[in-house]
A protein has these predicted regions:
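Short coil turns that delineate tetratricopeptide repeat
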Residues: 48, 82-83, 126
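Helix-start (N-cap) detector for alpha-helical repeat units in TPR-like alpha-solenoids
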Residues: 20, 51-52, 85-86, 129-130
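Canonical tetratricopeptide repeat
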Residues: 56-59, 90
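Register position in tetratricopeptide repeats
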Residues: 29-30, 63-64, 97-104
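N-terminal leader/linker segments that initiate helical-solenoid repeat arrays
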Residues: 15-56
Length: 131
């Protein structure tokens, strides 16, 4: 009997987690980034390695021009999935935007990493739309 209760408890957590993610996706599609960010962050607590959730949080940070947060999220993804061209591309894009908004000396120090990220994305997927 106790095993059945534990099973249903775990199942309810799973259902709650999925519905949180789905709600967050809908909010993101409606460009309600602040609300979506809260739900994605909540979802990430229960599934800390969920790549799609991390990517959405990076995308939201990019929309909010929070380049440091976007970089942190995309860096996690490119390290965890080094053969995914899109993660390298997004990481390079966030770095490039941070460099653009930084002073010239700081930007100069970032250019090599931006270039490396874009070149890696292009090597991984020659048909990548934006590389």
């Amino acid at each position: 009997m106790k095993n059945i209760q534990i099973f249903f408890l775990l199942l309810s957590f799973s259902v709650f987690s999925q519905s949180t993610f789905e709600k967050a996706e809908k909010l993101y599609a409606q460009k309600k980034y602040n609300e979506a960010e809260k739900l994605f962050s909540e979802h990430l607590k229960s599934q800390p390695n969920n790549a799609k959730t991390i990517e959405y949080l990076g995308d939201i940070a990019g929309h909010q021009k929070d380049w440091n947060t976007a970089i942190t999220n995309y860096k996690k993804l490119k390290v965890s999935y080094p053969k995914n061209a899109n993660y390298w591309y997004k990481y390079g894009g966030a770095l490039g935007m941070k460099a653009k908004e930084s002073n010239k000396f700081k930007a100069l120090g970032m250019i090599d990493e931006v270039e490396e990220s874009f070149l890696t994305a292009a090597k991984l997927d020659v048909k990548h739309v934006e590389s």
